[in-house]
Design a protein with these regions (language model features):
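C-terminal structured subdomain/cap of oxidoreductase catalytic cores
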Residues: 3-9, 70-72, 89-101, 139-197
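Mid-domain catalytic core of redox enzymes
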Residues: 1-66
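Flavin-binding catalytic cores
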Residues: 7-8, 27, 34-36, 40-50, ...
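A glycine-rich dinucleotide-binding beta-alpha-beta segment and adjacent secondary-structure elements
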Residues: 48-56, 107-175
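Flexible loop/turn segments at secondary-structure boundaries
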Residues: 8-11, 61-64, 81-84, 124-126, ...
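A generic secondary-structure boundary signal that marks alpha-helix termini
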Residues: 84, 110, 194-197
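Conserved FAD/dinucleotide-binding core of flavoprotein oxidoreductases
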Residues: 3-5, 15, 22-28, 67-100
Length: 197
C-alpha cells in the first residue's frame, strides 16, 4: 500500500489528472514472455527481479481515502515464494521487494517513485502472521485442478453451503475463487435466498 502525492503519469497514457485508466485495475506486464520469466525467476530466487505488478488506485473512486490532490495505491505481486530459498527470511527482504515493485511501476510512470510519500509492504510471511493466510495465499487455497468448480473448497462442499445449517462460504475459498471480484459472495447470497423459500 502506497501513499502518493500525485497520480502516476504513465508514458503510454500521459497525464497527471484523473483519467479512466487510473480508475481501472492496471497490470504491468509487457508480454507473455515477461510473465513467464517472472514466474520462473520467482521460483528460483523467491521473487522476480522483473515482477508483474498489479496496481489499483482506489482513491480515484473514493476521495475520502486520501487528502485532496493525494492518492493511495495498492501494488500486488503474485509471484513471490511463501518460503525463500537459501535460508533467507521475508522480514529481511520485504523492503527490498517493495522498492523493486516501486521501481517497476516507475519504468512505466516516471513520476511514480518521486511521488511516493510512504508505503507499507506485506510479504507472504506478513499475510500469514497478520491475517492467517497460510503461506500468504490470498486465494484461501490453491486454484489447482483438484480445487476448482464443484470441488472448491473441497469436493462435496462446492455449493457454498457448509455442513452446519445456516453457514455459507463466500470468500476466495469458494468457487470461482479469488481474483473474480464479488462472485463468490454473489453466488453464496443466491444460495442463502434459495434457502429462504
Amino acid at each position: 500500500n502506497v501513499a502518493l502525492s500525485e497520480l502516476p503519469d504513465f508514458s503510454c497514457l500521459p497525464g497527471r489528472e484523473r483519467a479512466e485508466h487510473h480508475t481501472a485495475g492496471i497490470i504491468l506486464a509487457p508480454s507473455l514472455r515477461y510473465m513467464e520469466q517472472a514466474f520462473f525467476d520467482a521460483r528460483q530466487h523467491g521473487w522476480s527481479q522483473q515482477p508483474i505488478v498489479e496496481m489499483l488506485i482506489p482513491s480515484t473512486l473514493d476521495d475520502s481515502l486520501a487528502p485532496k490532490g493525494a492518492h493511495v495505491a495498492s501494488l500486488f505481486c503474485q509471484h513471490v515464494a511463501p518460503e525463500l530459498p537459501g535460508g533467507k527470511a521475508w522480514p529481511e527482504h520485504r523492503d527490498e521487494v517493495a522498492k523493486l515493485m516501486i521501481d517497476t511501476v516507475n519504468r512505466y510512470a516516471p513520476n511514480f517513485k518521486a511521488s511516493v510519500l510512504g508505503y507499507r509492504a506485506l510479504s507472504p510471511f506478513d499475510l500469514e502472521q497478520e491475517f492467517g493466510l497460510i503461506g500468504g495465499d490470498i486465494f484461501h487455497g490453491a486454484l489447482s485442478l483438484n480445487q476448482l468448480f464443484s470441488a472448491r473448497p473441497v469436493l462435496g462442499h462446492g455449493n457454498y453451503r457448509m455442513p452446519l445449517k445456516g453457514l455459507y462460504l463466500c470468500g476466495s475459498g469458494a468457487h470461482p475463487g479469488g481474483g473474480v471480484s464479488g462472485l463468490p459472495g454473489h453466488n453464496a447470497a443466491r444460495e442463502v435466498l434459495k434457502g429462504r423459500d
